[in-house]
Amino acid sequence: MHAIISDLKRFAVHDGDGIRTTVFLKGCSLKCVWCHNPEGIGFKPQLAFYKDKCIDCGECVSLCPSGAHKIGEHGHSFDRSLCIGCGKCSEVCLGNALTFYGKKMTVDELLPLLLEDKEFYETSGGGVTVSGGECLCQADFCAELLKKLKENGIHTAVDTCGFVSQNTLDKVIPYTDIFLYDVKAVDEAVHIKCTGQPNRQILKNLKYIDSCNKPIEVRIPFVPEYNANEIDKIGELLATLKNLTKVRVLPYHNYAGSKYKSLDMENTLPEKLPDDESLKNAIETLKKYGIKEVI
């Protein structure tokens, strides 16, 4: 069994407690307008080309089996329609202008890499977080990986948007120590506007995980143009959870514009950023509902 991995991030400190390694699986069931990891949306391998970093060395041209790269009068050009997704060019790029997202790996190939930092996990109270995209789109792989991690005494976290079936959740719940769960909106119309999908199953799954007595850290991407008026509703919802450990309010940023360009993807990022006052108000609103830890 294999999965398509978009990235591995060692020494991560924002994807759960302690020092962690975060495994980013490719493919997502939502399409959030503010997505800051567009390389994780699609399920197929993708090559990112950062033209401003290219030094026109020509290494990719000589190696590319499909002729997708060319050096001409106006420098390096890349024809994405010819790319077969092998990623070989990114391995020889001298200017770091090419980044390949989508390495195919088995659990047995991935596990030793994750165990390399076991000492750091143990001393910091960390572990391994499986994320995406939406990692549970590759649930069988996740379940096998999480099981192997638990067999090796590693703390596990699943970072999910929750837009999956309950049967899918059941595959990973036994091997997951904590869920990092995104809540973007309670109002379904708002959620559809934000993500392209309804949220009925997402809210149902949140309550289901809680009923399984699994710790839940809720993450709220705070995007003023879209969900500023949802904070009270979210607070009411979270107040009903028995296993909520903390809530993180994640202020929207628009740093990912260059990623969209490098992948030839439409940039849907909103223009308006949250100011300090609106962010503070959101946090204080959530605290009104008796939530002990809001960050």
Where would I find each of the regions flagged by the language model?
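Hydrophobic packing within well-folded, soluble alpha/beta domains
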Residues: 32, 54, 60, 64, ...
